[in-house]
UniProtKB/Swiss-Prot annotation:
Organism placement in taxonomy: Bacteria, Bacillati, Bacillota, Clostridia, Thermoanaerobacterales
Biological source species: Thermoanaerobacter sp. (strain X514)
GO MF terms, alphabetically ordered: DNA binding; excinuclease ABC activity
Keyword Membrane belongs to the record: no
Protein name as it appears in the record: UvrABC system protein C
Its biological purpose: The UvrABC repair system catalyzes the recognition and processing of DNA lesions. UvrC both incises the 5' and 3' sides of the lesion. The N-terminal half is responsible for the 3' incision and the C-terminal half is responsible for the 5' incision.
Length: 615
């Protein structure tokens, strides 16, 4: 049966539709209030669809549907199918199967606390999900310091009295129920306290502990009272770090989102008893072209589908298309009413704005980390091209002059693929007459590495601090803006100084664009589409920019200095003439009338300049 024939048979009932590709793989799952209307929209208005939907439809070879009695049932089925199949074109909670939880096995006689990535219907209590394994392990460590409950899988009843206390008992992270150091009743009380702490009910827990401490003191159990007192202090210290974000004893999850071109970051603040008890951020993929409300709705469905706990209220900052339906679904899972709130003013609005700012920061940090990793990969790619393991520090050199005048050299530095401008260096060419790029390059390289040798000697003698040195750090790779002649000039200097560093010329094509690298072994053609090519082009452009900027600065100084020798020409007129003509040669060719047109010039000053260059 063709898709067109199937479309005619769609019922006017709620349900779930399943898109499949030519291999029968599920690539998209959606729900509909009316299957007939929703599914037909895809195939009857293809040109009006989002680009991502158009791509998806180009792969659809078949579809199926499942009829449900209500839209709520359709939502529940949609959540289950997305979780099971993780279809390619659905908005997905990134790597949700890997998010870790804290598990407390309250279903066991002597409960344990542990790290897990699976929620099972085993009667245990689960807390999370957390965004990282590190966060889970640090939280478990903190809980065990205050409530020393076990993590091992010993059979306590069977091993009682047969084993010795482990290391965790001696460092205060376990109360050793296996050796009867604590009776069962007191151990269960510890576990209950740990659960209250993880639930965010810390004020209630402190009140309960104070009652226990008072009772222990009245019964002259002073050691026990002191232990409880220390517990209270530890809990209060952690509570001090929690920001009071709400009045009363509210249970809220506050959700907001920030996005880049290819990923969306969802930030969740968990408020328990009116205090911020934790926060986590998660990533959603396949969100290009989607509205914020759609993305947050998808997150809510996937996040709470397997969550061990659902709060009374979810606060977010955007209208959700399925707000009422989601509220009904969450209420069913929780067992009583769950409210979804979109505040426009007041305390709740301030809270959701704060969560948005945190989502934005988390996204910026993620982008920064991804850029760092990307840069490392680019440097590795470039290093492999030139036979190095990793060119951490790359130095690039260029020469700039105007027909031999105002001759300068420049050195730019890239560390881990990024420019390090604090280590750029400028060189006035002192010993080369006229325009000779090879000799100029020899001079720059010789001076740079002689400085390095001198500074290293001073550092070894203790006469120079390493962080004060300007040239001591040596490059792993040298680039020069030029061809094989420039490369050979640099290699000759380095050889004479006993230094061995790979040198490559950054050659250009007939249109003065970066083409590749050249060395005595030949030219390396690098495809323009590679990241290594783009890094080389960036280095070449930066070396050229830095050299020509310095050259123009020097030229400008000389130009203005020469003009100041002319009667009636001060700094202001000299600058105006430089801005207008850009070179001494152009001023020499200018007529009196041309000179008079420059801002601040008059007949007398123009005549003086004209005559000065015709003596």
């Amino acid at each position: 049966m063709t898709i067109e024939e199937k479309l005619k048979l769609l019922p006017e009932k709620p349900g779930v539709y399943i898109m499949k590709d030519k291999s029968g793989k599920i690539i998209y799952v959606g729900k509909a209030v009316v299957l007939k209307n929703r599914v037909r929209q895809y195939f009857q208005n293809k040109e009006k669809q989002l680009p991502k939907v158009k791509v998806m439809l180009s792969h659809v070879e078949d579809f199926e549907y499942i009829v449900t009695d209500t839209e709520l049932e359709a939502l529940m089925l949609e959540c289950n199918l997305i979780k099971k199949y993780k279809p390619k074109y659905n908005v997905l909670l990134k790597d949700d199967k890997n998010y870790p939880y804290i598990k407390v096995t309250v279903n066991e006689e002597y409960p344990r606390i542990m790290f897990t990535r699976r929620i099972e219907p085993d009667g245990a209590k689960y807390f999370g999900p957390y965004s990282s394994a590190f966060a889970v392990r640090e939280t478990i460590k903190l809980v065990r310091k205050m409530f020393p409950i076990r993590t091992c899988n010993k059979n306590i009843e069977k091993d009682m009295g047969k084993v010795r206390e482990c290391l965790y008992y001696h460092i205060g992270l376990c109360s050793a129920p296996c050796t009867n150091k604590i009776n069962k009743e007191d151990y269960i009380k510890l576990v209950d306290q740990a659960v209250l702490f993880l639930d965010g009910k810390r004020d209630w827990l402190i009140q309960k502990l104070k009652e226990d401490m008072k009772k222990a003191a009245e019964e002259l159990r002073f050691e026990e009272a002191a232990r409880i007192r220390d517990q209270i202090f530890a809990i209060e210290r952690t509570s001090e770090k929690q920001k009071v974000v709400s009045v009363g004893e509210d249970e809220q999850d506050i959700i907001s989102m920030a996005r880049s071109a290819d990923i969306s970051c969802i930030q969740v603040f968990f408020v328990r008893d009116g205090k911020l008890s934790g926060r986590e951020h998660y990533y959603m993929k396949n969100t290009e072209g989607m509205e914020r409300g759609e993305i947050i709705s998808s997150f809510i469905k996937q996040f709470y589908e397997g969550a061990p706990y659902i709060p009374k209220e979810i606060i977010t900052d955007v209208e959700l298309d399925e707000s009422e339906l989601l509220s009904e679904w969450l209420s069913q899972k929780r067992g009583n009413k769950v409210f979804i709130t979109i505040p426009v003013r007041g305390k709740k609005k301030e809270l959701v704005d704060m969560v948005y700012q945190n989502a934005l920061e988390a996204l910026k940090n993620d982008i920064s980390i991804r850029e760092e990793i990307s840069k490392d990969q680019v440097v590795l790619e470039l290093s492999n091209l030139v036979g190095l393991d990793y060119a951490k520090r790359i130095e690039a050199y260029d020469i700039s002059n105007t027909r031999g005048q105002d001759n300068v050299g420049s050195m730019v530095v890239f560390v881990d693929g990024k420019p390090k401008k604090s280590q750029y260096r400028k060189f006035n060419i002192k010993y080369v007459e006229g325009q000779d790029d090879y000799e100029s390059m020899r001079e720059v390289i010789e001076r740079r590495f002689l400085h390095a040798i001198e500074e290293k000697e001073l550092i070894e003698k203790g006469e120079l601090e390493e962080d004060k040195a300007k040239f001591a750090e040596m490059p792993d790779l040298i680039f020069v803006d030029g061809g094989i002649g420039h490369v050979n000039a640099v290699l000759q200097v380095l050889s004479g100084l006993g230094i061995s560093i790979p040198v490559y010329g950054m050659v250009k094509d007939s249109k003065h664009r970066t083409r590749g690298l050249v060395s005595p072994q030949g030219e390396i053609d690098i495809p323009m589409t590679t990241k290594a090519f783009r890094l080389i082009a960036q280095i070449q452009e930066e070396a050229h920019r830095f050299a020509i900027t310095f050259h123009k600065e020097k030229q400008s100084k000389r130009f203005k200095s020469e003009l100041l020798n002319i009667p009636g020409i001060g700094k202001k007129r000299a600058k105006a003439l430089y801005d207008a003509f850009k070179s001494i040669e152009e001023i020499k060719r200018a007529s009196v009338e041309d000179l008079k047109k420059v801002e601040g010039m008059n007949e007398k000053a123009a005549q003086a300049v004209y005559e000065y260059f015709r003596k």
